[in-house]
């Protein structure tokens, strides 16, 4: 049996210059692999706990406590375990922590080891990570969601919605979809420049211009699609991440200087969907507004994709409740929201069994680690959300997907 021989961790920096955990796993056959844990900006209340030091260094954001938990506590229980039994490795860490949200060890400690262990096992077998986690049939390239205009918590501007995205559906392969999205991105930059807008980018690589309202980004993106030579609605569709939990105060939604009830905001979305080729709206209502979510799903659930991110936080138990109540029809998948590879896979399988679409997702604080690219293919999520094509930590994922495509991957495209 090939077993885990050593586990270590140290502090590194993410794409926002904040500390995060890099974990390394060494196997008894000499294989060594590592993984870097991402970190979110807008986070759901029920996410697994990201352990920060809360001391003077790095403005309180150091992760030396999480690193110590890997080196001193997690190592003790996973060393000697079968390298190819991912569930046993993850279960051992979960039992050691003893809480539902990893508030003892920190999800950033546990996930780092979980990801590194999976990567080490794949490397030991000399097979790609997506093949190790997904089996022989894992070969479908996801449709990407490119975040090309940022607002909300991801940018310092007057736009309320957090992300305005394009989805290149109408292409026969991933590389052409990637090229189209990139050409639209560059065309958008030229349009913004010509109009005197800032082309500074937000955390995820999208532009963050100071626009007058939440509809102006949609108009600019439609213009960019057309001027780049593509057809909106047929080849390229739009997607929004409203991140509305950030807008929800005292039972109402505050945006564009006005207050909206759940019903009013739902009708606002319905009108946007009539005017623009919107395929997906993420976190259209607050994670606390379940009654509103039921109304949103009844109103638009048969027309567009309604994604729960803060709503479900990649949590199997919460998703099951949402399924029972007919809340949303899709779920964003962020491994660090739940804390381990195994738990992430369990949530995806529950969603897929119940007809919910899955979107593998990055966080705003990312790294050069491309784990989620393989994970999306492994789990056949069908969609991936990992930013614009302008920052290296985002392009690391797209470039990995290009590699996977060379290994006979198929692109989902319109079959989504």
UniProtKB/Swiss-Prot annotation:
Enzyme class: lyase
Residues that hold Mg(2+) according to the record: 241, 282, 309
Localization per record: Cytoplasm; Secreted; Cell surface
Record: active site: 204 (proton donor), 334 (proton acceptor)
Ribonucleoprotein as UniProt keyword: no
Gene3D superfamilies reported in the protein's UniProt record: Enolase-like C-terminal domain, Enolase-like, N-terminal domain
GO biological process, any: glycolytic process
Family of this protein: Belongs to the enolase family.
Protein name: Enolase
Protein source organism: Campylobacter curvus (strain 525.92)
Upper taxonomic lineage: Bacteria, Pseudomonadati, Campylobacterota, Epsilonproteobacteria, Campylobacterales
């Amino acid at each position: 049996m090939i077993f885990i021989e050593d586990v270590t961790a140290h502090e590194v920096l993410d794409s926002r210059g904040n500390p995060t955990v890099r974990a390394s796993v060494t196997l008894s056959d000499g294989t060594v692999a590592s993984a870097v844990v991402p970190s979110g900006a807008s986070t759901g209340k029920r996410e697994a706990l990201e352990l920060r030091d809360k001391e003077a260094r790095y403005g309180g954001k150091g992760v030396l406590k999480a690193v110590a938990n890997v080196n001193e506590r997690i190592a003790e229980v996973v060393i000697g375990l079968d390298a190819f039994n991912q569930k046993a490795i993850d279960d051992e860490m979960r039992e050691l922590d003893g809480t539902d949200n990893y508030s003892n060890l920190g999800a950033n400690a546990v996930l780092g080891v979980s990801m590194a262990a999976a990567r080490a096992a794949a490397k030991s077998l000399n097979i790609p990570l997506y093949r190790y986690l997904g089996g022989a049939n894992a070969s479908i390239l996801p449709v990407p969601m490119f975040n090309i205009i940022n607002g909300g918590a991801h940018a310092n501007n007057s736009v309320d919605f957090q992300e305005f995205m394009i989805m290149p559906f109408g292409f026969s392969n991933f590389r052409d979809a990637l090229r189209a999205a990139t050409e639209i991105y560059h065309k958008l930059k030229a349009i913004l420049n010509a109009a005197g807008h800032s082309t500074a980018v937000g955390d995820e690589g999208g532009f963050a211009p100071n626009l007058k309202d939440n509809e102006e980004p949609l108009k600019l993106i439609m213009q960019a699609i057309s001027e780049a030579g593509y057809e909106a609605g047929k080849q390229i569709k739009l997607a929004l991440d409203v991140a509305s939990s950030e807008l929800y105060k005292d039972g109402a939604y505050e945006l564009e200087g006005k207050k909206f009830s759940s019903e009013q905001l739902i009708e606002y979305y319905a009108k946007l969907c009539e005017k623009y080729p919107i395929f997906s709206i993420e976190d259209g209502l607050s994670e606390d507004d379940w009654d509103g979510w039921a109304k949103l799903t009844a109103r638009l659930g048969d027309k567009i994709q309604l994604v729960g991110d803060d709503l479900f936080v990649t949590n199997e138990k919460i998703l099951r409740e949402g399924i029972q109540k007919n809340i949303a029809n899709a779920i964003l998948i962020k491994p660090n929201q739940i804390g381990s590879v195994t738990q992430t896979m369990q949530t995806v399988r529950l969603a897929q069994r119940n007809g919910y679409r899955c979107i593998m997702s990055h966080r705003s604080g990312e790294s050069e680690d491309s784990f989620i690219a393989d994970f999306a293919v492994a789990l056949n999520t069908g969609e991936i959300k990992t930013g614009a094509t302008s920052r290296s930590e985002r392009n690391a994922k797209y470039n990995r997907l290009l590699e996977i495509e060379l290994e006979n991957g198929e692109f989902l495209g319109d079959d989504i």
